[in-house]
């Protein structure tokens, strides 16, 4: 296996060199390493560091006693960065023999023998057998087969990545239903749909183990969904968490959408705005998907860590922090196309909505997305007025 040395943050590792003619080089290499996910890993360092500080302030525990597991480690880069840059004990697991040997080599390269260990186990077996303060599930594809074991294992925080955005967002409807026991809709807000479907799946799995959750930070970036969930032990916390579950009624004719809380609900089929037939998505998460104060703590951690993507991280976290807690976002260009109107700057639209007495914010999902409590009819009136 031919390798090269790369550096992320303050962590140096050896990674395989993929074949030069590979269509997707990361998956063609003997051990998976995707340089495009450095942004994800930079956010992970800052978010995990922020959560560790919370844990240290709330519990009688030492930093070196906090245990983190990366269930799908491949080269080990994610877990090594947590051990070296956050300073907690990290277990890096992978079923691949090549990955297992490479992780051990990379532990030595970084001198982290006292803070890190490599394991070669089936991820579900490892997570069902051992408990960790922080469980990180970042598989290639769907995390669905591992959520039960991860929910069982996590004491304090559960971090999950999903790269199967087509099933999550409704583009592959039946696959999404099978994997997440939820009906997603492929709408203009499909990225938020995918995030809320994933959060709903996590909430249900945690509830099975008498645990609730508080989403601290969630984002949809490029081809993946990522979330950081504080785990709240106890049946009462689980029951409270499930009260944030529900459905979304969406009218494809006029763009009306409405969240309906509860797992056993009655939803009128007729759209109250235009009389068209609504479509139903869910069950999914309808509560907040980030905590503003935690976002501020993550931003503060950026100053303590030399991250190559620091400014991109800051931009994403700031947008997440400032978003309204309203499902689901609107897309300015989609509405303008429907109306035959010219699109103004997104900030002008936000200001006009606020001037009309409504709440409004941009979102991190796309550059043309916004959230507001204004009815769809009012949104259209304001867009038409702005376009002249």
Curated annotation (Swiss-Prot):
Transmembrane segments: none annotated. InterPro entries: SAM-dependent_MTases_sf, Trm1, TRM1_arc_bac, tRNA_met_Trm1_C. CDD domains: AdoMet_MTases. It catalyses: guanosine(26) in tRNA + 2 S-adenosyl-L-methionine = N(2)-dimethylguanosine(26) in tRNA + 2 S-adenosyl-L-homocysteine + 2 H(+). Keywords: Metal-binding, Methyltransferase, RNA-binding, S-adenosyl-L-methionine, Transferase, tRNA processing, tRNA-binding, Zinc. Dimethylates a single guanine residue at position 26 of a number of tRNAs using S-adenosyl-L-methionine as donor of the methyl groups. This is tRNA (guanine(26)-N(2))-dimethyltransferase. It comes from Methanosarcina mazei (strain ATCC BAA-159 / DSM 3647 / Goe1 / Go1 / JCM 11833 / OCM 88) (Methanosarcina frisia).
């Amino acid at each position: 296996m031919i390798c090269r040395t790369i550096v992320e943050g303050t962590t140096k590792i050896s990674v395989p060199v993929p074949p030069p003619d590979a269509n997707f080089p990361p998956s063609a290499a003997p051990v998976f390493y995707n340089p495009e996910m450095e942004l994800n890993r930079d956010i992970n360092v800052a978010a995990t560091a922020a959560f560790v500080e919370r844990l240290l302030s709330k519990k009688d525990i030492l930093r070196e006693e906090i245990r983190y597991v990366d269930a799908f480690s491949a080269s080990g880069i994610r877990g090594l960065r947590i051990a070296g840059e956050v300073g907690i004990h990290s277990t890096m697991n992978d079923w691949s023999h090549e990955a297992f040997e490479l992780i051990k080599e990379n532990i030595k390269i970084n001198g982290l023998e006292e803070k890190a260990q490599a394991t070669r186990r089936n991820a579900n077996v490892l997570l069902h057998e051992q408990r960790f303060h922080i469980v990180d599930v970042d598989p290639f594809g769907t995390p669905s087969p591992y959520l039960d074991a991860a929910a069982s294992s996590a004491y304090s925080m559960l971090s999950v990545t999903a790269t199967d955005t087509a099933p999550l967002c409704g583009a592959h409807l039946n696959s999404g239903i099978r994997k997440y026991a939820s009906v997603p809709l492929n709408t203009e807000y499909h990225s938020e749909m995918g995030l809320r479907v994933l959060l709903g799946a996590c909430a249900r799995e945690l509830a099975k183990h008498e645990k609730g959750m508080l989403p601290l930070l969630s984002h949809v970036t490029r081809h993946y969904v990522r979330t950081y969930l504080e785990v709240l032990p106890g049946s009462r916390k689980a029951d409270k968490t499930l009260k944030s579950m529900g459905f979304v009624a969406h009218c494809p004719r006029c763009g009306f959408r409405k969240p309906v809380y509860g797992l056993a609900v009655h939803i009128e089929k007729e759209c109250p705005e235009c009389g068209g037939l609504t479509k139903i998505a869910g069950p999914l998460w309808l509560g907040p998907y980030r905590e503003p104060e935690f976002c501020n703590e993550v931003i503060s951690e950026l100053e303590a860590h030399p991250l190559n993507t620091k400014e991109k991280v800051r931009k994403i976290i700031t947008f997440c922090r400032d978003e309204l807690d309203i499902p689901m976002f609107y897309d300015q260009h989609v509405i303008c196309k429907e109306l035959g109107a010219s699109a103004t700057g997104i900030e002008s639209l936000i200001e006009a909505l606020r001037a009309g007495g409504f709440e409004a914010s941009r979102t991190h999902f796309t550059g043309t997305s916004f959230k507001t409590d204004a009815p769809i009819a009012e949104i259209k009136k304001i867009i038409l007025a702005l376009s002249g």
